[in-house]
Amino acid sequence: MRVLVTGAAGFVGSWLVRDLVGDGHSVYAAGQAGHAFPADRGGAEWMGLDVTSAESVAEVVARAAPDAVFHLAGQASVGDSFHDPLGTWDVNATGTLRIASALPKGARLLLVSSAEAYGAVPEQEQPIAEDRPLRPCNPYAASKAAAEMAALQAGESGGIQVVVARSFNHTGPGQDPRFALASFARQLALIRAGGAEPVLRVGNLSARRDLLDVRDVVRAYVRLMDSGAPGRVYNVCSGAARSMREAVDELVEISGTRARVEVDPERVRPVDLPLLLGDNGRLRGLGWAPAIPFRQTLSDLLEWQAGRLDTRTPAAA
């Protein structure tokens, strides 16, 4: 099968490309235009893509002529979305519409959305099922909710098969240290290497999140592409919540450091959800289940960050 992956050079995309190539597909990997492609192309054909340009999207789709598209490209940071809401919307919402509109009839599209779109759901009404109304409470979440509507409408009127993966929090080796657990892992790796004082700077640790390993996420996306029903939304989540405090404590323990944990006001979001917990029953019904223990995820994340340290740089990232 000819497969196009957008956002292929990103955290999840790079893992997905690796798995799809391993499964024997002809993979066309589209990364952000103007950015360097991975040194190891992994058997995929790489292309530059600017989702804010209809011309760029049309060129990539024409070249790949895909039977299936995994659309992962997007602005993925809640924090960054507060600084640039218009740019976030153009990339995530309008960019998705550009992709969906360019696909030939009969193509299959898996849109990767976000559980942030649910907004602040009362704790007693969680875990959250897919039929929950969307009430996004940050610019990133709003852009992802709009992307879903755009893709599903294109599926109705454009003759493409659209499946939506509404993903909850995920982490693991390869994650950018702009994101919480990857940042903590990088700081601890630097502390362990003697390159920083033993202080771990964190944000809000009272928040509880449904956390899943990136490799389990990729398995879910492949399963949804193969078996997901067109027009349906599927939560991609572990079905269990843990506080960020628990995750930090376990990460510190794994690191073997005695780092002191300090809250950095700069890391606290203007708006944060106290609990985000998903119901993964619909996805499990397709035969998927999480396979990687959370402690293994944290250990792999820490070692990945440690392998990319430059101890001459500060630990603030």
Question: Residue ranges of each PLM-predicted region?
Answer:
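N-terminal Rossmann NAD(P)H-binding glycine-rich loop of SDR-like oxidoreductase domains
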Residues: V3-D23
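NAD(P)H-binding glycine-rich loop region in Rossmannoid oxidoreductase-like domains
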Residues: V51-V91
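NAD(P)-dependent short-chain dehydrogenase/reductase
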Residues: V121-Q126, L152-R209, V214-R223, A241, ...
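Catalytic helix-loop patch of NAD(P)-dependent Rossmann-fold dehydrogenases
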Residues: H83-S101, R108, E116-V164, N169-T171, ...
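Amphipathic terminal alpha-helices
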Residues: F294-A317
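Mid/C-terminal beta-alpha module of Rossmann-like enzyme folds, strongest
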Residues: F184, S227-V268
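Conserved C-terminal active-site "lid" loop/helix of NAD(P)H-dependent oxidoreductases
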Residues: V214, V233, E246, V268-Q296, ...
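Glycine-rich Rossmann NAD(P)(H)-binding loop
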Residues: T6, N169-G174, P198-R209, Y234-R242, ...
